[in-house]
Amino acid sequence: MTLSPYLKEVAKRRTFAIISHPDAGKTTITEKVLLFGQAIQTAGTVKGRGSNQHAKSDWMEMEKQRGISITTSVMQFPYHDCLVNLLDTPGHEDFSEDTYRTLTAVDCCLMVIDAAKGVEDRTRKLMEVTRLRDTPILTFMNKLDRDIRDPMELLDEVENELKIGCAPITWPIGCGKLFKGVYHLYKDETYLYQSGKGHTIQEVRIVKGLNNPDLDAAVGEDLAQQLRDELELVKGGSNEFDKELFLAGEITPVFFGTALGNFGVDHMLNGLVEWAPAPMPRQTDTRTVEASEDKFTGFVFKIQANMDPKHRDRVAFMRVVSGKYEKGMKLRQVRTAKDVVISDALTFMAGDRSHVEEAYPGDILGLHNHGTIQIGDTFTQGEMMKFTGIPNFAPELFRRIRLKDPLKQKQLLKGLVQLSEEGAVQVFRPISNNDLIVGAVGVLQFDVVVARLKSEYNVEAVYESVNVATARWVECADAKKFEEFKRKNESQLALDGGDNLAYIATSMVNLRLAQERYPDVQFHQTREH
């Protein structure tokens, strides 16, 4: 069966994001992936602040100063016969809900683990989000050029802590100064590592066969024997790769390598284009939309301000779900039921914008937004439906925000509501007083809000600590019981930026007690946009 040109384009697309704990090497991997995709000629390895070769994917002013990626940018590059869309996710302590929401716009994730440290806190949280949609996961064990933990231990830890089976595809030979390369379990080939070649794509020497005497000569008899012994254990004690289980999010293929040394990244990329799914169907509130449909649909998962310091603009990022975007197309914004002509959509290579003539399912478009587009907005060619599964997450950090000039209360509220629509932060207005409480998932969100209030709304604000540990959105099917709950808990209720009722708890114990006391009230940790 020959596919139509449209379906061929759809089948070529792979859209993925990288999830990791800060400093596990995510930005370096992003660089190397782009190098293999020929999107950049030499990888601008991320160094300290003095280095002038800033990594291509870190670009807002604050990021340049801090050497971190705050904003989720999008990069498209060709690899083999595929077109890959890589959505970069903020990695540092300073990550935000954007990171979570970006994971709702991809069909697959690459989990990067620092092999010296194993599974870390942020990785756990991000994996929980991928679980909401059983997203397929590939795993890259990074930093093999350093001393690492025992590889079998690492696999056990991933399986036990993240509840996903591991299927090793490559296996390391030594580590640190003794790192010699990796063996590919399914190709029966050993790839030999040379250090100092990290900035370019290196020619790799390959030794075929596990019992080939050349292997002993290349890595030394001891390491060669150790490899054979370890592989006996691996083959006996780990999962075989099974594509169906991978696509169901039940097992993850595991690759070993060093992103800094640019070694092993291509094995992972080959796995990605071979196994990761082409654009997947999506649920709406009325039906499932298939990528093969010819009518255009898409949803907004993130809004970013100030991508162009010369213009104070915002860009809404839209994931194309079905149909082909063409320049000058008329689309319906379902929430407002208005038709808009989109003539200047953008694609990105972090920071370099280019106007796009056409886009297909799996691609990400940037739409200019002057405050009319919100997160979760659905665009169609007229059909009235809304994509689901683009959540707000309950914040984990809270501050009270106060004005230096009390006369600017109106501007402050306007600014905060707009920033919350954009997903930069969440705002809660307690019912029992006039406080304004700002909730975030990462600390840096607070700095960003104050900086943007000042530059965009001319409002000077400061934070104070507030006795709030967590928030949950509340609802109840029984109106009478809900009224009683609201009456008795008025001092702990607040409205968010979209006027949804939330319970703000002073501690986790306080939240648990409230949940036990009011079993008919539902306390939600996420809320649909």
UniProtKB/Swiss-Prot annotation:
Taxonomic superkingdom: Bacteria
Keyword terms: Cytoplasm, GTP-binding, Nucleotide-binding, Protein biosynthesis
Xref: InterPro entries: EF-G-like_DII (IPR053905), EFG_III/V (IPR035647), G_TR_CS (IPR031157), P-loop_NTPase (IPR027417), PrfC (IPR004548), RF3_C (IPR032090), RF3_dom_3_sf (IPR038467), RF3_GTP-bd (IPR041732)
GO molecular function, one term: translation release factor activity, codon nonspecific
Predominant place of localization: cytoplasm
GO BP term (any one): regulation of translational termination
PROSITE patterns for this protein: G_TR_1, G_TR_2
Binding annotation for GTP: 20-27, 88-92, 142-145
Compartmental location: Cytoplasm
Pfam families associated with the record: EF-G_D2, GTP_EFTU, RF3_C
Gene3D superfamilies: P-loop containing nucleotide triphosphate hydrolases, Peptide chain release factor 3, domain III
A GO term from the CC aspect: cytosol
Domain tr-type G, chain residue ranges per copy: 11-280
HAMAP family, A to Z: Rel_fac_3 (MF_00072)
Recorded family membership: Belongs to the TRAFAC class translation factor GTPase superfamily. Classic translation factor GTPase family. PrfC subfamily.
Function: Increases the formation of ribosomal termination complexes and stimulates activities of RF-1 and RF-2. It binds guanine nucleotides and has strong preference for UGA stop codons. It may interact directly with the ribosome. The stimulation of RF-1 and RF-2 is significantly reduced by GTP and GDP, but not by GMP.
Entry protein name: Peptide chain release factor 3
Organism of provenance: Shigella flexneri serotype 5b (strain 8401)
Phylogenetic lineage: Bacteria, Pseudomonadati, Pseudomonadota, Gammaproteobacteria, Enterobacterales
